[in-house]
Amino acid sequence: MKHFFIYLLLLTTLFSCSNYQKILKSDDVNFKYNQAVKYYNNTDFNRALPLFTELRPVFRGTKRAEELAYYYAYTHYSIGDFLMASYLFNQYIINYPRSSHSEESKFMIAYCHYQEAPEYSLDATNTIKA
């Protein structure tokens, strides 16, 4: 009988829908946005990235699009995808040139190229870009 309850608890845990899965399946975009920012602020970038990816086309042309683009670029940087992060920071500067984050984004483009640069004895393309 004791083993039955242990197996039942284990099966319930395995097949229950996690809170993150409920967020992903939710239709409320404002709730998803708030949860993505919460994950971002808690440095859980692997959970924030799919939410930001899903929300980008939804918020395009709104007031939140600028902030979302900034978070999205930094999320890529934080997971170590420096090539994509430099591209996204560049797109951020093109789309929002008068933003308060534009100077920081220019620095992050150079820093992402620096992170991508190999040793000095190898190809120096990213070093020159930085």
Where are the language model's segments positioned?
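Sec-dependent signal peptide recognition
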Residues: 2-10
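Acidic, polar-rich low-complexity tracts and alpha-helical solenoid repeat scaffolds
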Residues: 5, 14-130
